[in-house]
Every structure is written in structure tokens, then in C-alpha cells.
């Protein structure tokens, strides 16, 4: 399985870091601190819970890249999405 959490964990990249993944996959990841949330940011690691949270992930990533969440919130509001 090439799920991001499993790959990152197997390579020691989740050690002491917060993350989220889909389903119960977190039970198979030894390193890291699982957080039950749609999107989790831990410094330069941004993880998403799954396809159902694609908007949350995309908006979070956009805000990070822009360095400002105000324009991202404006766009979310424009499509009637609460973020």
C-alpha cells in the first residue's frame, strides 16, 4: 500500500509529527501522532484525511502558499463553502 502516512512513517518522516490519514490506516503507522481532523498542519507537513476533504486540503495548501488565508477564505465564501 502506498498511502502517504504509511510511506512517510516507514521512512521515519512522521517521528514526533502530527498527521491525519483516511480510515483506520493510522493503526498501522508506528511513528507520528495521529490527529482526527480533516487537515493537519505540522510545520512543512500538511496531511489530509481523504478525498471527502479535498476542498479543505486545497484551501489549506493555498493559504500556506499565499502566506495569507484572507483571499482563500474569500474564494471559499464565493462557492458557499465554510472553511
Regions found by a protein language model. Name each.
Residues 3-83:
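Active-site-adjacent pocket-lining segments in enzyme domains
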